[in-house]
Amino acid sequence: IVTLDCEVKCSNGFPDPKIAQEEMLSITIKNHQSKRIVVWGVGKFTTDREDVTYVECESEVHLLKEFLIFWEKHLPDCISGWNTEFFDIPYICNRIKKLFGEDELKRLSPWGSVQEREVYKMGRNHQVYNIQGVAALDYLDLYKKFTYSAQESYRLDHIAKVELGESKDGNPYNTFSEWYQKDFQSFIEYNIQDVEIVDKLEDKM
């Protein structure tokens, strides 16, 4: 199982994964067994953590190429994350399609098949992708189904506080775009924190 989280630019409000017009800034994955983390990012980041590997990329195109090479070498049985079904997976798939075409998208699947469909949920249609041969567990969905108490918010930072007693670092700047433009180091640390929290929730559930 790998836990996945991506961050994208947001110059025009919250990015729509179906349109996927904003460039990707980073992808972070954590292997649930080895606990190792790999981050691809388009900026400077340094870490002395032995469990974190950072791949500095020149551009989003470079980032996605490196990510696909790694993915094919270390094909996971299952992807997990927080709202990955409706955000991270469709966003990554749509950017790959936009930049490289349909054939490159097929590289995500051991069977060379990635299928797109529409799902009606929370009062609207969502585009989702099924990566054939790779199971997907969205912990936001599982959490809603298997916990008995309704939460005032299902944001990951709120659930982390409720379930783990952990506070997630917030944005120290006025806007999200200011954050990644001015302090890429803490921005990536935030991205890493996301996969670590989901990994801990996974252990707990």
Predicted stretch roles:
Residues 1-78:
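Conserved RNase H-like, two-metal-ion catalytic cores of nucleic-acid enzymes
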Residues 6-10, 31-33, 85, 138-143, ...:
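Short, flexible loop/turn elements at secondary-structure junctions
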Residues 12, 86-91:
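Short catalytic/ligand-binding loop motif for oxyanion handling, primarily in non-cytosolic enzymes
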Residues 37-40, 47-54, 89, 98, ...:
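Active-site-proximal helix-loop-helix substrate-binding element of RNase H-like nuclease domains
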Residues 68, 93, 199-202:
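Non-transmembrane alpha-helical segments in soluble domains
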Residues 191-205:
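Short amphipathic alpha-helical coiled-coil/interface segments
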